[in-house]
Amino acid sequence: MDAINDWENQALTHRNRLAPHAYFMGYETADLAATYSRELSRGFVQLSGSWQFRLFEGPAAVSNEELSTYESEWDHVEVPHLWQVDGYGNLAYTDEGFPFPVDQPFVPSDDPTGVYQRIVNLPAVPAGAREIIRFDGIESYGELYVNGKFIGMTKGSRLSAEFDVTDALVEGDNLFAVKVLQYSDGSYIEDQDMWWASGIFRDVYLMQRPAAHLVDFRFRTHREGDAALITLDTVAEGASRVVFTLSDGENVVATGECVDGHAECSVTDAHFWNPEDPFLYDLTFEVYDGDQVSEYVPHRQGLAEVTVEGNHIYLNGTYFKMHGVNRHDHDDHKGRAVGLDRMRRDLELMKRHNINAVRTSHYANDPRFYELCDEYGIMLVAETDMESHGFENIGNIALVTDDPAWEPAYVDRVERLVMQERNHACIIMWSMGNESGYGCNIRAMYAKAHELDGRPVHYEEDRNADTVDVISTMYSRVSQMNDFGEHPFPKPRINCEYGHSMGNGPGGLSEYQEVFDCWDCIQGQFIWEWCDHGLAAVTEDGVAYDMYGGDNGDYPNNSNFCIDGMVFPWQQPSPGLTEYGQVICPVRMAYDAEAGELTVTNKRWFTTLEDVCLSAETLVDGDVVCRKTLMPGAVAPGESVQLPLVIREAAVGETLLTVHAYTMAAHVWCEPMFQLGASQFAIANHPAPAIAAPTRPELTVEETEQEIRIHSLNGELTFSKVNGTVSEWKASGRDVMASGPQVGFWHPLVDNHAQEYDSLWKDNFIDVMQTSTRKVSWKQDGNAVVVTVSQRIAPPVRAFGMRVELVYTVLPSGRVDLKVSGEPYGDYSDIIPRIGISFEVPGCDRAVEWYGHGPGENYPDSLRANPVGHYRTTVDDMFTPYVMPQDCANREGTRWVALRSSHGDGVLVTRPADAASNPFSFSAWPYSCETIDNAKHVYDLVKGDTVTVNINDQLLGLGSNSWGSEVLDSYRTRFESFSFEVSLRPLTSADLAQALAPIKEA
């Protein structure tokens, strides 16, 4: 029988790894301990940095010499890193499939194997002290050698590992060598939706423990009224006694000695931790060796107790909801090798968008991340490193989850997580992993988690919550979530994944939130996911872009399915995150114009609105004419206050009220007067009366076999009788358009419409519909010339289409009123992306000015974050740089839009009549629709010499159907009868207000 390799033995989780324990550092003095800087802790040596490195084709290719002899000629790499990201071996991305043959627990013999070497000069280890090396992440299997001596082995890629290296060290130079395998038996339960990559990807460092030292501690809080009853359990080695102190930054609130490893105390008028007020006490242990303090161990400790009563979870006795996201570790330059600054920036962005919870999908994080969540106020569904999704491809996702032979591997992963992180106030519940089916090993994990800690346990694929404490679903539709609310489950419920954020989207978050707000039994929701997993790259021509699956020749792959976050790979918020932040804003408002009263509701869970101020802005036709500051005061959670606010409506124009909510306080995540959100209310609309147009010369018409040319005082407009388009339009000697209006039902495909495309549009060729012009005619109508174009727009292969009529009314002023109507024929009446027109204007540097929703990108089911106003930008700045280019730049609720060159000339689009009651949407791109649609990366986008302008009468909502929820019925656009009108006006350098003035032309 063949010998069993350690990396192919699921029953063997480690060799010589130290037992898991709370994460902490020991210091030589109290002053050093007060810094909380691990770099100043006893014997700390940072081993992250430059290492010698060589990649071997497999573990058998690594000789003992390469683990015991320094190889100065090897390459240098900077740890932490993933070697594939640094150009060694092959990057691969799959959502769920294993990139190797399924033969658990075995992996290929040509298993890429990296060997790291580093010389570390160390002083002699003090008598009785122990030298510990700690790895916070090795993927997927690591062996450690010191001075040629085998120290130990670890698995569980995203879990920390410590080894005692004391006996292998010498005074002076020491050779540390680490052998890392890309694949191991652990890879079968580490099949998370992310890049397959490997290496020492988190920090590695040395720590020193004195002869008398703390081994572990456990801190538990029980709330009784305003008091916190605290239980402390400690494990120490060689210590004569252990003394603890708890202080609030100014005063010691509790102190005592842990007798036989146990102590109890109470804190009166305790300041309990919560995500809105994440107060942390300073907990310090003094470990004595005889009469001398051997080490000081500090920990920033929140007072928090999580309890479950019926189907509700409580934090310190208070009900709450989690408005969260699923977060993977990701850095666009380093993959999963995420540094502290990146973690901080993630949490800052979350808090700045009203997010109060994270699910650590689907593995344990760097231990400092939990410390930061305590500090910033982020509640955690703390998930361990486990997913076996790839087995679904062979018909049994629970193949190893329900195999007792794999129990040690499963239990090891939850034990290490809970033991290391259970002192953190931010952790609301533990999660056993993701998408691994259900079976005996989940039950074993649950038992271990509850043996070690009392907080509730979550696991989505325990679909009936037979074992776990929290029932969960993912990607449930709005109607299904409402049904869950109407028929409550006996246990608490969360929606652990929803709102799939692939590319442009998600849409429909407001409707979800209305349901979540309605039902107390639904206690949390988590967007999938936080950040795109794109990796920064540069083409041979020097063009920057972001890679996804398949870009490295990897096959099989899941293409851009990893580009599914609310934050771009470079940590810039997407329009989807901006929308989510507004949807979950805890300052809710309603306005009663008749009563002159603004109702402000506090949807926080723990704190009042005492820190909030409101700025109420009155807008007329999009511009602010009046501001007033309001103070809601100490409105308690869940309560409302009515504030007097009388808005004077304008005699002429559209009057709107926009109320911005700011926090006046400075936080670790924001500066004072940071905006939390805004609400807008329609007050009145009194369109300006049309004024009589000045007398202008009559229009003249020239007709040839192929053209109809209409002359006005300052310009001319030419129609092609061949294809029915505006072939030329000039005003004051300048081109108004480069290509005239064409009716369209398609726009570049967005990821969230992928399932509609696969099930409807692709087979019906909606994206390649053809236009046939049947008739072009004209007539004189008073002072106007009316040109009528009849067309049929239909796909190849199929026998359905749309009979379209475009009626252009050309007026002496140069204005063109366009009425577009359509009647369908055939058997297709399902959804389509849009109903509208597109045209091109010359130049690619156009300024854009509009009155409508803004300033950011918005869509029919995603516009809460963008109130109506008067905005200015450029075409380039409107374009959203999605990693895979797709439809973007839309602005809803548009009353008018002007696109102008640097000379001030251009075109104005509005409705012929009251635009406020009948707005349209528009987008403008420096590319053609075809260019965007065919592009796979931003480097495929090549600018032409025109700007594409899209005017939409109807636009399909975004939804989140890349993997989730289709577009809600109220945001659907169907292939049905339609009719709409727009006015097109040439602009010169004259004032825009003059062009906007309503003019009645006979």
Residue ranges and their predicted role:
Residues 260-269, 622-652:
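Intrinsically disordered, low-complexity Pro/Gly/Ser/Thr-rich segments with frequent PxxP/GP/PP motifs
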Residues 1-39, 79, 94, 188, ...:
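Extended substrate-binding grooves/exosites of carbohydrate-active enzymes
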Residues 211-238, 574-612, 692-706, 820:
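Surface beta-strand/loop "capping" patches
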Residues 2-8, 12-17, 37-38, 52-56, ...:
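Accessory beta-strand-rich segments of carbohydrate-active enzymes
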Residues 2-26, 36-38, 151-152, 175-208, ...:
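Glycine/proline-rich low-complexity spacer/linker segments in large multi-domain proteins
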Residues 84-87, 94, 137, 182, ...:
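Beta-strand/loop-rich accessory regions of lumenal/periplasmic or secreted enzymes
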Residues 82-85, 90, 97-106, 155-157, ...:
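An acidic-aromatic loop/edge-strand motif
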Residues 167-173, 233-309, 651-703:
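Extended acidic/polar, glycine-enriched regions
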